[in-house]
Amino acid sequence: MYQVLKPSRSSTLPMRHLNYHVRHWGPDTSPLPTLVLLHGWMDVSASYQFTVDALQQERRIIAPDWRGFGLTSSAQADHYFFADYLADLDLLLDHYAPGEAIDLVGHSMGGNVAMMYAGVRPERVRKLVNLEGFGLPATRPAQ
């Protein structure tokens, strides 16, 4: 059985008519930028436990459960738009890392959200890692 090396803490942030669950690892402050981990579709923040345990540097790490996943409440809708995830991420960062340029990792759908967020809020993202996110279709400026 796997033995957790770096236990997480949980918090809940009420925002946008939801109760957002956020998992935290490491100290509340660190000289390194906050590392934000975004899970993919049908996944949860706890899936990053193995990754966090493998990191050598001690730093502040946060990972939300997206709306409708894990311990975050679900909106009364049968679908979500990327704009919902982008707005949620922006508010989460304003709360947990105000004004800070973060290191952002996203897997699958989380990778897509991370790429879009870095595109619309480049001042908030210091480094970006996209794990298995798919690219968006090419467009022409006229579109």
For each feature predicted by the language model, list its residue ranges.
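A structural preference for long, well-packed, hydrophobic secondary-structure segments
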Residues: 9, 19-24, 37, 107-120
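Conserved hydrolase catalytic core segment
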Residues: 99-141
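Short, conserved structural micro-motifs that define repeat-unit consensus positions
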Residues: 39-46, 66-71, 79-80, 104-116
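Conserved HGGG/HGGXW glycine-rich cap/lid loop of the alpha/beta-hydrolase fold
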Residues: 21-74
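Short aromatic-enriched loop/helix-cap "lid" or pocket-rim segments at secondary-structure transitions
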Residues: 73-76, 139-143
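A conserved amphipathic alpha-helix that caps or lines the catalytic cleft of carbohydrate-
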Residues: 52, 93, 117-118
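Active-site loop/oxyanion-hole signature of alpha/beta-hydrolase fold enzymes
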Residues: 16-18, 23, 56, 63-105
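N-terminal cap/lid segment of alpha/beta-hydrolase-fold proteins
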Residues: 2-19
